C-alpha cells in the first residue's frame, strides 16, 4: 500500500495521492462500475471538491443529484451531506481535494488498511474514529452521533478498536502523479 497508492478491496476503489499544499489532501480516485457506494456523509470542517477526469459520476450534494462527466467539477461545502458513485459503464477517475485536509490521510490509511484485513467499518469502529476524522454520517444529526459515540467509545476501546492504528500510519506514502 505504500508509495502514494492505497486500495480498498471491499469498495473496489483505488486512491492515488497527488501533490498538494500542506493544508490540503488531493487524491485521484479510481472506481469501477461495480464499486460500493460511500454512505451519505459530511465533513464538518472540510470542503471536498470533485473534478472528473474520465467516466461518469453521479454526485448527491445537499439533496441535489447531478451527473458529472469529464472536466466537470463540483464541491461539497463543510457540513454538507454528500455521496457519489460511478454511474457509467467504465472506470471512473476523478480528483477529490479536502480543504483543509485535517486528518483525512489517516482516514484513508485506516479504512484501506482495515479493508485489506477484511474488516468493514462497523458501529464500534465508527464510534472510535469519527471524532478524529471529523467525518460523520448524514443522519442522525451530528450532535446525536457525537453523544452516541461518546457512550459507545469506551466499550469500543475495551474491545480493541482505535481511532487509528499505528500499523497503517504513513501507508499512503509520498504523492505521485497518476499515470
Task: Give, region by region, the residue ranges found by the protein language model.
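Jelly-roll (double-stranded beta-helix
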Residues: 1-26, 35-40, 44-46, 51, ...
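N-terminal amphipathic alpha-helix
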Residues: 29-30
